[in-house]
Amino acid sequence: MDPQQKGIVNTCFLTTRIPSWAGARQNVTGSDLGGKPVPSDVLESGRPLAAPRVRTLYEEQQLNMLTVNVILDDLKTQVAAMQNSVTAIQEELKDLKQRVAAR
């Protein structure tokens, strides 16, 4: 191997032959070889880490509320349909009782 080419990766894939001085990938938030975080120069670094989680949790709660509201509307529709069925059955029973009483 040519000494000037030592440590150079000539493929589009990362391999395990990258020397230890190469560090982590550039322009991404990741970790170095020791497991410590490496900040990105490109990604936004001024925002607090908890902010996306709080916003995501809030959005998730809103979606859950929408889902619950849809389920409640479906249940209300089903209950109304069942009440109409019960009313129709009660009217049929009333008619049958009148027919039986007339005989």
UniProtKB/Swiss-Prot annotation:
Residues 72-99 form a coiled coil. InterPro entries: Hexon_assoc_IX. Induction: Expressed in the intermediate phase of the viral replicative cycle. GO terms for molecular function: hexon binding. Structural component of the virion that acts as a cement protein on the capsid exterior and forms triskelion structures consisting of three molecules that stabilize three hexon trimers at the center of each icosahedral facet and fixes the peripentonal hexons. Dispensable for assembly. During virus entry, recruits the anterograde motor kinesin-1 to the capsid docked at the nuclear pore complex thereby subjecting the docked capsid to a pulling force. Homotrimer. Interacts with hexon protein; this interaction tethers the hexons together. Self-interacts with adjacent proteins. Interacts with kinesin light chain KLC1; this interaction leads to capsid disruption at the nuclear pore complex during virus entry into host cell. This is Hexon-interlacing protein.
